[in-house]
Amino acid sequence: MVDWSTCPAQDSPARDAWLLSHIQAGEGEATLQEITVEANGHLGRFYVFAEPLKLGGVRINASAALQQQIADALGCVFLTPRLADLVFANRSVTLPPMPRPITSSTAAMIEQSDKVGAAVPPGASGIVDTEGKYWVLVKSLFSASAKAARKAANYGWHFEGSSFQGLKGEPTVSLPGVRVIQGVGTVHNDQHTDYSQIVRLVSRTCEVDGQQRDLADVLMDPDLAPLVSHEGPLPGWRQPDVTEAPPTTTVTPGGGEETPTTTAPASSGGSSLARKAAGGVALFSALFLLGRALARLLGDLCWTGAIPASVVNDGYKTNK
């Protein structure tokens, strides 16, 4: 049971710890939805959150550093800009961006979530977009200067047409005729959060050419990366310099009715892989991801400090 009255009122290390503890305890709410893409002669199936991660019905806000900790706990990876575009292209429900005066308070998090939720039609299923902006993986994050400054990259708030409420935005990285209020920007560091930064992730477990793969490997593979990255292979697959932890829950591929992220979505309408996941695939995924994470931890000399409060945001205008 999530009691939001016990959550710290402002963005802070204490609030980050509160959110993370609930997610690690398996109280997060999300549904995985399959998206299919072809590139370089390969066919990939990837499993994204149909809606942003919720906790007690609230779409949570997170810094890039906190989102990485959440992704680790759930066996997931950040979206790339290309994957964010694919989410929009595969949406079943279209919502307009809903900007407001900049704030990172808990009250604003809840208010914004309620406003977005009220716009979702009752009984809606499939992918709902656009609900906010995403922390994403791009090549520039892995440069020495970006790592030294602990940079994060954000992207999102898709819309169709030439402008939205007077904002021209920028072209998306891969969708003709679609623009984003927030083009790929690296103004913020990995500690920043605000009401617009929601948590939409993609499962590490994916399928390429009919074979189960780890998305972490796909992202760095020169031949396969174009499936998920407009930049080709990335130098890494996690937000840099956030200590990796083994998953505490496992999100397995599938679709169908909304289920907690701690269990595999069960639906006869899901993919063939989803139906297989109920048994051996789910166990394999959990052990596979746990083994990889533990192996990396043995040699991990990364920063392990607490996540400080967010820096000041410059609003919902395009950040560069």
Language-model features: locations:
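Single-pass alpha-helical membrane anchors
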Residues: 271-297
